[in-house]
C-alpha cells in the first residue's frame, strides 16, 4: 500500500522537508488559485500585483480586505494538524510554504518558512512600521480606504504581490540542498522560483513525494504520487508512521 511505503520513506529519511501550496488549505474554506474553482477563475491576478497597488491602492484594498477577512476566519484542517504532528515527532524538519494564511502556525507547526509572506501582518510603505492586519481591517471597516499609517504612508499587506521577488527563497533553497526527501503537499508546482525547491532535492539525489489532486509538471520525476485530498492522505500517512514507529 502506498501509504505504508511513504511512511517508510519518511522514517528512514535523515532530513525531510514539507513543501506546501494552496491545496492544503482548500479544506479550510480557502480557494486555491489555479484549480477548477480557483481564485483566478473569478478575479484577475492583476488585482494582486504591485503595479495595481501602486496605481490604485483604494481598489486594491477593496479586493484584498475581502480576501484577508476570509483567511482570518479560516481554521486549520486535518492536513495542517497532521503535518504539525509529524514535525513534533521529528519526522518533518522544516515546512516551506507558498501560503500566506498562517494556518501551519495556527495548527502548531514551529519551523515554517513563508515564501510569499503572511497576510497576518501589514506595514507602512514609508516608515515600515508593522501592523497586525486585523487592526488594518478595522481601519478599512471604519472607512479608511486605503488604510494609512500615522506618518501618512499607505499600509500594505506583508505578502509577495505579483511583480515582486519571492521572500526567503535562498534560505529555502539552502535547506532543500541539504534535504534527502521532500513531500510536496497541495501545490501545482508551476510557480517559479518556488518550484525549484522540490526540483533541487531531486537533483541532489533525494526523493520526492507528491500529494496533489491535479497533475503536476514534476509527477514524472516523483518517487510517489498520491491523488487524494490531502486532508485525507496526510492523516493516513501520519497513522502509518505511528504504527511503524511503535511496532
Curated annotation (Swiss-Prot):
Q: Provide the residue positions that the database annotates as binding nicotinamide.
A: 33, 100-101
**Family matches, as Pfam families:** SIR2
Q: Does the keyword Metal-binding apply?
A: yes
**Which residues of this UniProt protein bind NAD(+)?**
22, 26, 33-34, 98, 100-101, 116, 187-188, 212, 230
Q: Which InterPro entries match?
A: DHS-like_NAD/FAD-binding_dom (IPR029035), NAD-dep_sirtuin_deacylases (IPR050134), Sirtuin (IPR003000), Sirtuin_cat_small_dom_sf (IPR026591), Sirtuin_class_U (IPR028628), Ssirtuin_cat_dom (IPR026590)
Cite the active-site annotation.
116
The record's family statement is:
Belongs to the sirtuin family. Class U subfamily.
- Do you know which NCBIfam families this protein is assigned to? PRK00481.1-3, prot_deacyl_CobB
What name does UniProt use for this protein?
A: NAD-dependent protein deacetylase
Taxonomic lineage: Archaea, Thermoproteota, Thermoprotei, Sulfolobales, Sulfolobaceae
Amino acid at each position: 500500500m502506498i501509504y505504508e511505503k511513504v511512511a517508510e520513506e519518511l522514517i528512514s529519511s535523515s532530513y525531510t522537508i514539507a513543501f506546501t501550496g494552496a491545496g492544503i488549505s482548500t479544506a479550510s474554506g480557502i480557494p486555491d488559485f489555479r484549480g477548477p474553482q480557483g481564485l483566478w477563475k473569478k478575479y484577475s491576478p492583476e488585482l494582486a500585483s504591485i503595479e495595481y497597488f501602486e496605481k490604485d491602492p483604494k481598489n486594491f484594498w477593496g479586493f484584498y480586505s475581502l480576501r484577508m477577512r476570509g483567511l482570518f476566519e479560516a481554521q486549520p484542517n486535518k492536513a495542517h494538524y497532521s503535518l504539525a504532528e509529524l514535525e513534533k515527532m521529528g519526522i518533518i524538519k522544516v515546512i516551506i510554504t507558498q501560503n500566506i494564511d498562517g494556518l501551519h502556525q495556527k495548527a502548531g507547526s514551529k519551523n515554517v518558512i513563508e515564501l510569499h509572506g503572511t497576510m497576518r501582518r501589514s506595514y507602512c510603505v514609508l516608515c515600515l512600521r508593522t501592523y497586525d492586519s486585523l487592526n488594518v481591517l478595522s481601519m478599512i471597516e471604519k472607512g479608511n480606504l486605503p488604510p494609512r499609517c500615522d506618518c501618512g504612508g499607505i499600509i500594505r499587506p506583508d505578502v509577495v504581490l505579483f511583480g515582486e521577488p519571492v521572500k526567503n527563497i535562498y534560505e529555502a533553497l539552502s535547506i532543500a540542498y541539504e534535504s534527502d526527501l521532500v513531500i510536496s503537499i497541495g501545490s501545482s508546482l508551476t510557480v517559479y522560483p518556488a518550484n525549484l525547491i522540490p526540483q533541487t532535492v531531486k537533483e541532489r539525489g533525494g526523493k520526492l513525494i507528491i500529494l496533489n489532486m491535479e497533475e503536476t509538471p514534476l509527477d514524472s520525476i516523483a518517487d510517489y504520487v498520491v491523488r487524494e485530498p490531502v486532508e485525507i492522505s496526510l492523516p493516513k500517512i501520519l497513522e502509518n508512521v505511528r504504527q511503524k514507529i511503535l511496532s
